């Protein structure tokens, strides 16, 4: 199963026609996942680890008998960010459509695998529809999983066999992580069989600590037995161009860099931002697509407005938690396709999102 030997003909045909070779994360990850072991895959963004996590489960869904409708949700994907959840939902469309087409070419009944998303953005009518028609693959966040486990929605989680936790390093060791750990144990208590846990991590070490968080433990009287986790370490060297730029002569005295003739009460004498804006616009113009990260929603709005003012047209848009669901998805799609020059974002875009144009 190290390459494609363990996959069905349709899945192998689609993969071989789409990719030259499997990545290291896939070559090493598939055997562990196929064995049923809880698995932590450590690999950088863009290394194919998400497909490494999903493809085995998708292949099983595609070639097993379709269960009764109330028992269809067998794959649960948990994302720490809504934007990452939307990105994964988009990225699954290609493999699912490709495997259907490959099956048709091979004269096999094409699989009809459905996906669904449950986040804080999901309208109530969609949540109710999901209870009536559960998806095969459910994409959610830690908080939404908790809400599902405490409501009637937990009934659709009983058939879950695979749980994929993306960017697990970002929540392990945090309050959100503790909350998720409890939710995973509650999930294990209500499922028909204990789900296989698959964690994806990009940057953090020691991996043993992340693996321990992923596996959790099984109560044994007054003791606690950790679940064993297989660690797949597939790092990839990546060239980074890192530069620290100070746009003023002295950050403690921004007035020294104020333009000639600026009055004493001119705002440009009291802040470094007037010197920062032109530099950021230069960087924007020098690249196809750029993401500027800031610490607050207000700063995201102000910086986007100032860059657009300097450019004389809309060249960037702001992305943060207060932007509506529709606009966030629109911005992410435009950026992903390379049709938006830049985005000023808070942490809503910081994890694992594959923006090839950036």
In which residue ranges do the predicted regions lie?
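Helicase motor core with emphasis on the C-terminal RecA-like subdomain
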Residues: 1-13, 21, 27-28, 34-40, ...
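Walker A (P-loop) phosphate-binding loop of ABC-type ATPase nucleotide-binding domains
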Residues: 44
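ATP-binding Walker
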Residues: 47-48
